[in-house]
Amino acid sequence: MAKDVEGPEGFQTRDYEDPPPTPFFDADELTKWSLYRAVIAEFVATLLFLYITVLTVIGYKIQSDTKAGGVDCGGVGILGIAWAFGGMIFILVYCTAGISGGHINPAVTFGLFLARKVSLIRAVLYMVAQCLGAICGVGFVKAFQSSYYDRYGGGANSLADGYNTGTGLAAEIIGTFVLVYTVFSATDPKRNARDSHVPVLAPLPIGFAVFMVHLATIPITGTGINPARSFGAAVIYNKSKPWDDHWIFWVGPFIGAAIAAFYHQFVLRASGSKSLGSFRSAANV
């Protein structure tokens, strides 16, 4: 909640109060159309995200495959793939933030749930919608690129040769921490009260965080940092290697999201202790 107050120089500034923590379990949400509208928005956004990004990955591999008429350094390269992921997140967060919050990622939803920004019901429904949207998005890629999809790996995440499990897990934890920490910072109530007149300020750093993490971790894991993205690609591609490594792309992002939530709420924000107390109180009701 924000309100105009008189600054020291006579200018109008915006004061704010932290919104109250979301109830842990809010059954009343199930009766509201706004919840289902948000769930649909998450489904469609994740579908579009996976469709564009996995199509970009496969297109790059086609263009750079010298055995199939491609050329060395052909296609968009790793830089272009990173831009595709970061750019789509920027676009989709901008489009859906006012409807669902623009999570498009179970790890983001999990972090916001731990910080009492969303209820358990909303978090679970979002995660289900995100995973289903991811499956459908990759399914469209396979349907439209059936001759290339399996040949070029289906955009599925797996641990690259030469890297051990610990390295891959660490890459996913740290990468997701960067993303979720950016989400918390970009959507901070104090920042929103001050910069609410610039609506792109939240989607832009979130998309840029996704871009930077992809540049760093594509060579290691193909960059997950989004369990729905990894799950959707693994389901449609359905080969042993992505499934063998699949746990990394759930455990790593969830650990990274939890650390980011704790760091932002209980280290950087004084209101964190209040959220923790209200979480315990709600759990005991």
Curated annotation (Swiss-Prot):
The chain crosses the membrane at residues 38-58, 75-95, 124-144, 166-186, 200-220, 248-268. SUPFAM superfamilies: Aquaporin-like. Residues 1-22 are annotated as: Disordered. One of its GO terms (molecular function) is mRNA binding. The keyword Acetylation applies. Water channel required to facilitate the transport of water across cell membrane. Plays an predominant role in root water uptake process in conditions of reduced transpiration, and in osmotic fluid transport. Its function is impaired by Hg(2+). Inhibited by cytosolic acidosis which occurs during anoxia in roots. Its main location: membrane. Residues 59-74, 145-165, 221-247 are extracellular. It is a multi-pass membrane protein. GO terms for cellular component: endoplasmic reticulum; plasma membrane; plasmodesma. The modification N6,N6-dimethyllysine is found at K3. The modification N-acetylmethionine is found at M1. It comes from Arabidopsis thaliana. Belongs to the MIP/aquaporin (TC 1.A.8) family. PIP (TC 1.A.8.11) subfamily. Aquaporins contain two tandem repeats each containing three membrane-spanning domains and a pore-forming loop with the signature motif Asn-Pro-Ala (NPA). Residues 1-17 have a biased composition (Basic and acidic residues). Predominantly expressed in the root, with a strong expression in the cortex, endodermis, and stele. InterPro entries: Aquaporin-like, Aquaporin_transptr, MIP, MIP_CS. The modification Phosphoserine is found at S278, S281. One of its GO terms (biological process) is response to water deprivation. This is Aquaporin PIP2-2. Residues 2-37, 96-123, 187-199, 269-285 are cytoplasmic. PANTHER family: AQUAPORIN OR AQUAGLYCEROPORIN RELATED (PTHR45687). Disulfide bonds: none annotated.
